[in-house]
């Protein structure tokens, strides 16, 4: 299928872009010590530019020391300019065009992102300081031009400083920048646009990121007001608008990095409502992962260009594969947000990652070819085993995958049974097809034993046998009636009824609760010794409250079940007086979702040790954990063979 609209050229002021695909600015955490660019950030952008992207927008840069968060690079001195030149040079060498997102975080200062989690109340800006900030935006624009960027983007969304001025509930000023009128609320942003424009060549385009809809705040900027502002901004020198959604002060955060809970294109109706009323190119943002949808939106006139963000994290060749009719070969984003968001807010993570692309942010290392092709036995055809085989084959090795069951897929097939998670099943089935396309044999219905390892005599073994559900050791559980395992519920082998209690508030427990609600079970309670939603990731946990508000799914945190009787549990918790108390609760059905344990692997590793065969145990076979850990370990194991 051809995508003529998506891959047609477009001109922004004096800049001609080869197609309508934009890599939006996304936090990668690849900045070194707040001030330096290493090998990784240029290579990351070069991979997407070489992959066919029309415009790469480099993640946001801070305009001044006061707003310089440790996650981001600054752009307020010549050293920053010279460091960013490494990125623009890499993008240009790969055949792309480069823009940069220029930013002031406003109420989100350094302390918000400090690893100590220390927060301080920000000061009210004086008018003099506002004028200084406007000038600092202009100076950053000047430095960006000198760094070789082809376009600039002014970040005005997501409750950062420009949005704070625009929003009537966040703007509490009473002066000429205050919320007494739309003109006042827009004054700062228009001054910034004019100042940036003064420091840019006449033929260089200036973009601005805005929210297509302002929401979940005490008061909001209306669509009419946004449209009026865009007209004023265009007169001030703006050339295109990049319409996003979400803010950092409410549950609307979920729209900034949309997980699988949101349908692809979820923001497009909001964007289209603005586009039909403005006379300026519009970039659409909203979980676009399919080239057919992107092309359709442009053909229908809802957008002029499309931001393809997480989809290009998952596959940097997204554009080339789409243009060349190889859509089936695209490694698709599944919307888990485990690597692209949870790693951003994890102070231990050095950069973002991706469940579908464990080589993300490691592009600078390349894919080293094997000096000697080795025969590798991969045990387990789940997400980790299949991905290990793919990387091994790509490096020139000869992997063979062995799977004990009759079909590949592992727990990702089961994960896809939960509401809105079909992409997980699709992903692991894609990996199985990719293995076949690459000529990798998958032997199903074969249980690998020490004897088989001795018979095959591989050069290397990777054990990816995964984990299995285990019932907890609770008195009375084994003899109680109407007790189910979450795995059987999601697989459709069992259906609880009536008042249902789910033991375990991790991802499996919460998704089982969602599954039951979708299948007509109306009284569902999730209980956990910690918090409900642990290990689900921040955004997906937030969606529990959005999609299942109030008591739709009841939640009991800090509750430890100590006994199971006849349709009754006994549980202990700490009350407000800090005393441990016990209570009982009736159930009609009890579902066990307390987690998984790694399958035994010692017989396999011992056999390898005796035979002198190098062996790696990866993913849940090593430690029952998330899919993102399995694919990261698969990549690492494949790279060392």
Tell where the protein language model's regions lie, with residue ranges:
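Hydrophobic alpha-helical segments typical of transmembrane helices
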Residues: 44, 192, 270, 293, ...
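Flanking helices and flexible, charged tails adjoining ferredoxin-like Fe-S electron-transfer domains
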Residues: 193, 363-371, 381, 387, ...
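Rossmann-like dinucleotide/flavin-binding elements
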Residues: 373-402, 443-457, 464-538, 574-589, ...
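Flavin-dependent oxidoreductase catalytic cores
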Residues: 1-379, 383, 391-394, 399, ...
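Short gly/pro/ser/thr-enriched loop/turn and capping motifs at secondary-structure boundaries
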Residues: 249, 312-315, 407-409, 491, ...
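Short beta-alpha connecting loops at secondary-structure transitions
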Residues: 254-260, 304-305, 413-420, 618-623
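Rossmann-like dinucleotide-binding cores of NAD(P)H-dependent redox enzymes
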Residues: 401-437, 513-561
């Amino acid at each position: 299928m051809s995508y003529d609209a998506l891959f047609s050229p477009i001109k922004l002021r004096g800049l001609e872009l080869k197609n309508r695909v934009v890599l939006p600015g996304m936090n990668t955490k690849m900045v070194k010590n707040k001030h330096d660019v290493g090998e990784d950030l240029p290579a990351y952008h070069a991979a997407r530019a070489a992959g066919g992207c029309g415009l790469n927008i480099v993640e946001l840069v801070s305009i001044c020391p006061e707003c310089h968060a440790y996650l981001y690079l600054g752009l307020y001195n010549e050293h920053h300019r010279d460091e960013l030149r490494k990125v623009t040079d890499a993008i240009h060498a790969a055949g792309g065009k480069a823009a940069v997102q220029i930013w002031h975080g406003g109420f989100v200062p350094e302390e918000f992102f400090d690893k100590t989690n220390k927060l301080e109340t920000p000061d009210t800006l004086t008018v003099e300081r506002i004028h200084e900030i406007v000038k600092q935006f202009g100076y950053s624009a000047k430095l960006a031009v000198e760094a070789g960027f082809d376009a600039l983007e002014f970040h005005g969304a997501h409750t950062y400083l420009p949005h704070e001025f625009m929003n009537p509930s966040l703007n509490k000023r009473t002066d000429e920048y205050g919320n007494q009128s739309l003109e006042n609320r827009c004054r700062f942003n228009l001054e910034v646009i004019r100042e940036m424009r003064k420091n840019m060549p006449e033929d260089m385009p200036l973009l601005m990121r805005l929210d297509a809809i302002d929401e979940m705040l005490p008061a909001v900027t209306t669509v009419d007001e946004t449209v009026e502002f865009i007209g004023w901004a265009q007169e001030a020198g703006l050339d295109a608008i990049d319409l996003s959604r979400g803010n950092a002060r409410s549950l609307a955060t979920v729209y900034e990095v949309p997980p699988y809970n949101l349908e692809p294109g979820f923001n497009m109706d909001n964007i289209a409502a603005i586009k039909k009323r403005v006379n300026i190119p519009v970039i659409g943002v909203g979980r676009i992962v399919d080239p057919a949808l992107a092309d359709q939106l442009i053909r229908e006139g809802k957008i002029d260009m499309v931001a393809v963000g997480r989809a290009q994290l998952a596959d940097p060749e997204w554009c080339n594969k789409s243009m060349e009719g190889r859509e089936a070969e695209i490694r698709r984003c599944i919307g888990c947000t485990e690597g692209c968001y949870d790693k951003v807010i994890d102070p231990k993570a050095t950069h973002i990652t991706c469940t579908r692309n464990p080589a993300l942010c490691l592009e600078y290392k390349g894919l080293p070819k094997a000096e000697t092709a080795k025969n590798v036995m991969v045990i387990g055809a789940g997400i980790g085993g299949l991905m290990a085989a793919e990387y091994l084959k790509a490096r020139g090795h000869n992997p063979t995958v062995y799977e004990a069951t009759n079909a590949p897929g592992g727990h990702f097939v089961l994960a896809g049974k939960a509401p809105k998670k079909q992409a997980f099943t699709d992903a692991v089935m894609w990996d199985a097809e990719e293995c076949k396309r690459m000529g990798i044999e998958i032997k199903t219905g074969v249980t690998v034993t020490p004897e088989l390892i001795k018979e095959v005599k591989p050069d290397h073994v990777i054990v990816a046998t995964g984990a299995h559900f285990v019932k907890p050791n609770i008195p009375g559980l084994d003899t109680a009636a109407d007790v189910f395992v979450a795995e059987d519920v999601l697989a459709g082998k069992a259906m609880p009824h009536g008042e249902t209690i789910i033991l375990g508030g991790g991802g499996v427990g919460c998704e089982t609760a969602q599954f039951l609600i979708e299948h007509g079970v109306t009284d569902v309670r999730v209980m956990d010794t910690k918090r409900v939603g642990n290990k689900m990731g921040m955004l997906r946990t937030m969606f529990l409250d959005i999609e299942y508000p109030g008591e739709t799914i009841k939640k009991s945190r800090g509750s430890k079940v100590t006994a199971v009787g006849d349709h009754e549990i006994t549980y202990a918790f700490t009350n407000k007086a800090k005393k441990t108390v016990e209570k009982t609760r009736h159930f009609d059905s009890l579902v066990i979702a307390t987690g998984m344990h790694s399958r035994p692997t010692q017989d396999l590793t011992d056999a390898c040790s005796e035979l002198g065969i190098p062996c790696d145990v990866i993913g849940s076979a090593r430690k029952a954990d998330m899919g993102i850990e399995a694919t990261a370990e698969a990549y690492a194991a494949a790279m060392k063979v």
